[in-house]
From Swiss-Prot:
Keywords: Allosteric enzyme, ATP-binding, Cytoplasm, DNA synthesis, Kinase, Metal-binding, Nucleotide-binding, Transferase, Zinc. Coiled coil: none annotated. Belongs to the thymidine kinase family. It comes from Escherichia coli (strain K12). Signal peptide: none annotated. It comes from the Bacteria. GO terms for biological process: DNA biosynthetic process; dTMP salvage; thymidine metabolic process. It is found in: Cytoplasm. The keyword Nucleotide-binding applies. This is Thymidine kinase.
Length: 205
């Protein structure tokens, strides 16, 4: 039986690398995969999933108006799909997560979703909220804070490198804009208005 998987983490935990490896594993066995990524995130070019270690794959784009079940069913009828993989799945809508569950339940195709659990305010993304609620399997991909603890929070930095937790939920950016930290240092960085000061304090402890 196919299942719906949600692989979640903070930033820079290797989600895209894990997705590309999973897709390759299917393809190596002669199976066909379909990869999706969010249209909104074009840091590495539109229409592809790229990892920080240099791997990449062509990808279909989804936005808030995409009818994923209809798209996947139509393509599956033309040529069998053995696995659907979705990068940046935090940007899915509630309806799209439901449609992906229908891909699993009605078409018997496994769906593997990779994305962030929470935003820079520590609040769930809509896509992540419903994947946490409806997935068959939840898998945490771990990364670490500068202190060595598990990083479960994401700090957003302004142009001067200061952390802040106000503004729009979605602002696309990489390491210059976001950094993954543990909960303790997330709170401390916001309290003192400086990630650098917290890092310096930790080095001297």
């Amino acid at each position: 039986m196919a299942q719906l998987y949600f692989y979640y983490s903070a930033m820079n935990a290797g989600k895209s690398t894990a997705l590309l490896q999973s897709s390759y594993n299917y393809q190596e066995r002669g199976m066909r995969t379909v990869v999706y990524t969010a249209e909104i995130d074009d840091r590495f070019g539109a229409g592809k999933v790229s990892s920080r270690i240099g791997l990449s794959s062509p990808a279909k784009l989804f936005n808030q108006n995409s009818s994923l079940f209809d798209e996947i069913r139509a393509e599956h009828e033309q040529q069998a799909i053995h696995c659907v993989l979705v990068d940046e799945c935090q940007f899915l809508t509630r309806q799209q997560v439901y449609e992906l569950s229908e891909v699993v339940d009605q078409l018997d195709i496994p769906v593997l979703c990779y994305g962030l659990r929470t935003d820079f305010r520590g609040e769930l993304f809509i896509g992540s909220q419903y994947l946490l609620a409806w997935s068959d399997k939840l898998v945490e991909l771990k990364t670490i804070c500068f202190c060595g603890r598990k990083a479960s929070m994401v700090l957003r930095l302004d142009q001067a490198g200061r952390p802040y937790n106000e503004g729009e939920q979605v602002v696309i950016g990489g390491n210059e804009r976001y950094v993954s930290v543990c909960r303790k240092h997330y709170k401390e960085a916001l309290q003192v208005d400086s990630l650098t000061a917290i890092q310096e304090r930790h080095r001297h402890d």
